[in-house]
Amino acid sequence: MPTPSMEDYLERIYMLIEEKGYARVSDIAEALEVHPSSVTKMVQKLDKSDYLVYERYRGLVLTAKGNKIGKRLVYRHELLEDFMKIIGVDDTHIYKDVEGIEHHISWDAIDRIGDLVQYFQENQTRIDDLREIQKRNDFPEDE
Protein backbone atom coordinates (compact mmCIF):
# COMPACT_ATOMS: atom_id res chain seq x y z
CA MET A 1 0.00 0.00 0.00
CA PRO A 2 1.25 3.47 -0.80
CA THR A 3 2.00 5.94 1.97
CA PRO A 4 -0.09 9.14 2.22
CA SER A 5 2.72 11.05 0.49
CA MET A 6 2.89 8.47 -2.29
CA GLU A 7 -0.88 8.74 -2.64
CA ASP A 8 -0.64 12.52 -3.09
CA TYR A 9 1.88 12.06 -5.89
CA LEU A 10 -0.05 9.25 -7.58
CA GLU A 11 -3.26 11.26 -7.44
CA ARG A 12 -1.60 14.33 -8.94
CA ILE A 13 0.29 12.34 -11.59
CA TYR A 14 -2.92 10.60 -12.62
CA MET A 15 -4.73 13.94 -12.88
CA LEU A 16 -1.94 15.52 -14.94
CA ILE A 17 -1.89 12.60 -17.36
CA GLU A 18 -5.68 12.79 -17.69
CA GLU A 19 -5.54 16.55 -18.31
CA LYS A 20 -2.41 16.88 -20.47
CA GLY A 21 -1.60 13.38 -21.65
CA TYR A 22 1.68 13.40 -19.74
CA ALA A 23 3.24 14.37 -16.40
CA ARG A 24 6.70 15.89 -16.17
CA VAL A 25 8.69 16.36 -12.97
CA SER A 26 8.32 20.13 -13.33
CA ASP A 27 4.52 19.83 -13.72
CA ILE A 28 4.26 17.63 -10.64
CA ALA A 29 6.48 19.96 -8.60
CA GLU A 30 4.37 22.96 -9.58
CA ALA A 31 1.07 21.18 -8.86
CA LEU A 32 2.20 19.93 -5.44
CA GLU A 33 4.20 23.07 -4.62
CA VAL A 34 7.38 21.12 -3.91
CA HIS A 35 10.94 21.27 -5.22
CA PRO A 36 11.68 19.25 -8.39
CA SER A 37 14.36 17.25 -6.55
CA SER A 38 11.69 16.07 -4.09
CA VAL A 39 9.55 14.96 -7.01
CA THR A 40 12.46 13.07 -8.55
CA LYS A 41 13.08 11.19 -5.29
CA MET A 42 9.40 10.27 -4.94
CA VAL A 43 9.08 9.28 -8.60
CA GLN A 44 12.08 6.96 -8.17
CA LYS A 45 10.40 5.47 -5.09
CA LEU A 46 7.13 5.00 -7.02
CA ASP A 47 9.08 3.40 -9.86
CA LYS A 48 10.74 0.99 -7.42
CA SER A 49 7.28 0.10 -6.04
CA ASP A 50 5.97 -0.58 -9.57
CA TYR A 51 3.45 2.28 -9.61
CA LEU A 52 5.14 3.90 -12.60
CA VAL A 53 8.05 3.62 -14.99
CA TYR A 54 10.47 6.53 -14.86
CA GLU A 55 13.28 7.28 -17.25
CA ARG A 56 15.38 10.29 -16.40
CA TYR A 57 14.98 13.09 -18.96
CA ARG A 58 12.32 11.09 -20.79
CA GLY A 59 9.39 11.24 -18.41
CA LEU A 60 7.18 8.76 -16.66
CA VAL A 61 4.27 6.46 -17.36
CA LEU A 62 1.90 4.95 -14.82
CA THR A 63 1.84 1.17 -14.71
CA ALA A 64 -1.53 -0.62 -14.67
CA LYS A 65 -1.18 -0.78 -10.88
CA GLY A 66 -0.37 2.95 -10.64
CA ASN A 67 -3.17 3.89 -13.01
CA LYS A 68 -5.73 1.86 -11.05
CA ILE A 69 -4.68 3.38 -7.73
CA GLY A 70 -4.43 6.89 -9.19
CA LYS A 71 -7.96 6.64 -10.56
CA ARG A 72 -9.28 5.40 -7.24
CA LEU A 73 -7.50 8.19 -5.33
CA VAL A 74 -9.02 10.84 -7.61
CA TYR A 75 -12.44 9.22 -7.10
CA ARG A 76 -11.95 9.31 -3.32
CA HIS A 77 -10.98 12.98 -3.40
CA GLU A 78 -13.90 13.97 -5.63
CA LEU A 79 -16.35 11.92 -3.58
CA LEU A 80 -15.22 13.58 -0.35
CA GLU A 81 -15.58 17.01 -2.00
CA ASP A 82 -19.12 16.09 -3.08
CA PHE A 83 -19.89 14.91 0.44
CA MET A 84 -18.59 18.15 1.95
CA LYS A 85 -20.75 20.19 -0.44
CA ILE A 86 -23.84 18.13 0.36
CA ILE A 87 -23.42 18.51 4.11
CA GLY A 88 -22.99 22.25 3.67
CA VAL A 89 -19.30 22.83 4.32
CA ASP A 90 -18.27 26.28 3.08
CA ASP A 91 -16.50 26.11 -0.30
CA THR A 92 -13.48 27.92 1.12
CA HIS A 93 -12.87 25.01 3.53
CA ILE A 94 -13.62 22.00 1.35
CA TYR A 95 -10.22 21.42 -0.29
CA LYS A 96 -8.28 21.74 2.95
CA ASP A 97 -10.77 19.56 4.84
CA VAL A 98 -10.62 16.84 2.18
CA GLU A 99 -6.82 16.94 2.17
CA GLY A 100 -6.91 16.61 5.96
CA ILE A 101 -9.08 13.49 6.06
CA GLU A 102 -8.59 11.59 2.81
CA HIS A 103 -5.56 9.62 4.03
CA HIS A 104 -7.12 8.75 7.38
CA ILE A 105 -10.37 7.14 6.31
CA SER A 106 -10.88 3.51 5.33
CA TRP A 107 -12.08 2.41 1.93
CA ASP A 108 -15.08 0.88 3.69
CA ALA A 109 -15.96 4.34 5.03
CA ILE A 110 -15.42 5.80 1.53
CA ASP A 111 -17.88 3.26 0.12
CA ARG A 112 -20.47 4.17 2.77
CA ILE A 113 -19.96 7.90 2.11
CA GLY A 114 -20.49 7.09 -1.56
CA ASP A 115 -23.83 5.50 -0.67
CA LEU A 116 -24.80 8.59 1.32
CA VAL A 117 -23.79 10.97 -1.49
CA GLN A 118 -25.82 8.89 -3.93
CA TYR A 119 -28.81 8.95 -1.55
CA PHE A 120 -28.78 12.75 -1.40
CA GLN A 121 -28.02 13.28 -5.10
CA GLU A 122 -30.92 11.08 -6.17
CA ASN A 123 -33.46 13.45 -4.61
CA GLN A 124 -32.90 17.20 -4.21
CA THR A 125 -35.65 17.27 -1.54
CA ARG A 126 -33.33 15.34 0.77
CA ILE A 127 -30.66 18.03 0.41
CA ASP A 128 -33.29 20.74 0.94
CA ASP A 129 -34.47 18.96 4.11
CA LEU A 130 -30.88 18.84 5.37
CA ARG A 131 -30.50 22.58 4.71
CA GLU A 132 -33.66 23.25 6.76
CA ILE A 133 -32.25 21.25 9.68
CA GLN A 134 -28.98 23.16 9.39
CA LYS A 135 -30.81 26.50 9.43
CA ARG A 136 -32.61 25.49 12.63
CA ASN A 137 -29.38 24.34 14.26
CA ASP A 138 -27.14 27.24 13.22
CA PHE A 139 -26.52 29.94 15.76
CA PRO A 140 -26.16 33.57 14.72
CA GLU A 141 -22.50 34.67 14.62
CA ASP A 142 -22.89 37.20 17.42
CA GLU A 143 -24.37 34.88 20.05
UniProtKB/Swiss-Prot annotation:
Q: What is its subcellular localisation? A: Cytoplasm
Q: What is the regulatory mechanism acting on its activity?
A: DNA binding is strongly activated by Mn(2+).
User: For Mn(2+) 2, which residues are the binding ones?
Assistant: E11, H77, E99, E102
Principal subcellular localization: cytoplasm
* Family (UniProt): Belongs to the DtxR/MntR family.
- Under what name is this protein listed? HTH-type transcriptional regulator MntR
What is the recorded function of this protein according to its Swiss-Prot or TrEMBL entry? Central regulator of manganese homeostasis.
Q: What keywords are annotated for this sequence in UniProt?
A: Activator, Cytoplasm, DNA-binding, Manganese, Metal-binding, Repressor, Transcription, Transcription regulation
- Keyword Cytoplasm on this protein? yes
Residues noted as binding Mn(2+) 1 in the record, renumbered to the chain: D8, E99, E102, H103
Q: Which GO terms describe its molecular function?
A: DNA binding; DNA-binding transcription factor activity; manganese ion binding; protein dimerization activity
Domain HTH dtxR-type: residue ranges: 1-63
